[in-house]
Amino acid sequence: MKVSMFVMIVLCMVAVSSAGRGARRYCGRVLADTLAYLCPEMEEVEKRSGAQYARYGWQLPESREGARGKRGVVDECCYNSCTLDVLLSYC
């Protein structure tokens, strides 16, 4: 409970500070947490490193979420700067 409250406070601080500055970079856990906060209706995505995928000797195809692909959000918001409006377009 305390951890989730801390994460929510941090995300709110990030959102407020981003709104004043415009575009910024979101990478890794910050990107995932920000998308989870902005898009609560999105389903949880399970990691493909789990035991149920270990039996397959091939790479499973990338899942495409929403109108834009998951890799696109990394390209747009981690490698380059993006705004919260761009992040919201991935919901």
Swiss-Prot record:
The keyword Disulfide bond applies. Residues 1-19 form the signal peptide. InterPro entries: Bombyxin, Bombyxin_B, Insulin-like, Insulin-like_sf, Insulin_CS, Insulin_family. Disulfide bonds join C27-C78, C39-C91, C77-C82. Keywords: Cleavage on pair of basic residues, Disulfide bond, Hormone, Secreted, Signal. The keyword Acyltransferase does not apply. It is found in: Secreted. Residues 49-69 form a propeptide. Pfam families: Insulin. One of its GO terms (cellular component) is extracellular space. One of its GO terms (molecular function) is growth factor activity. Gene3D superfamilies: Insulin-like. Heterodimer of a B chain and an A chain linked by two disulfide bonds. Belongs to the insulin family. Brain peptide responsible for activation of prothoracic glands to produce ecdysone in insects. This is Bombyxin B-2 homolog. It comes from Samia cynthia.
